[in-house]
Amino acid sequence: VLANKMDAPNTQEVDIAGNVCESGDLFARDRPMPDVEEGDLLAILNAGAYGFTMSSNYNSRPKASEVLVKDGECFLTRERETFEDLFNKQIIPDYLQ
């Protein structure tokens, strides 16, 4: 659902896909949606594989932040990873330097 356009009429059918280059990374096909613009907030409900416990850094993708919503109030529970976070524990052997 478009969280910032909950009352907007659906004007099109769209496919909603994840951010990795796999054909199975698909949330919905032919989903009725209102007009989508840059900056809109897409809420994907019940997407456990994109939660931290099932996420991975496949294709060097940083893990998303996590937000808990309770009674209309939002709480950040995990910060988004950065690209620096992905590589800060790697060690380059001396012979490669």
What is each PLM-predicted segment?
Residues 1-97:
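Charged (often Lys/Glu-rich) extended helix/loop segments that serve as interaction or gating elements
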